[in-house]
Amino acid sequence: MNFTTAWALHPQLARDTVPLGDLALSRVLIIKDANYPWLLLVPRRPDITEIIDLDGVEQAQLMVEIDRTARALKTVTECDKLNIAALGNAVPQLHVHIIARRKTDEAWPKPVWGAVPPLAHDAAALDQFMNVMRAKLWVS
């Protein structure tokens, strides 16, 4: 791994998300699409595109953070299903999607990508969601 390069969030992820906070390894972000409660975990390591690019300790930490975040999101949203994926086809920087799905959402049962146009968050609802998620995740 190359730790000489400073970590920076990919510009596309910066445009498409709202920061929630940091866990030990990952930055937690909220996708700007109110159609779904949709979080991203982005390990704060430079030049990482795959989970296998992380060392074993970091891989284990990422799995702990995925578990922690997914459990918190499921509890907060009472969703029917969680979709968890690290795709990276459009944005090469390693990021893990954790999406709360409901059988009543517009895309169900298909994938969320491109199913419906993104819906802007209501500011008050987003603030409330952020506060509840922070409390569940103990994010600083």
Give each language-model segment a name.
Residues 1-140:
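HIT superfamily nucleotide-processing domains
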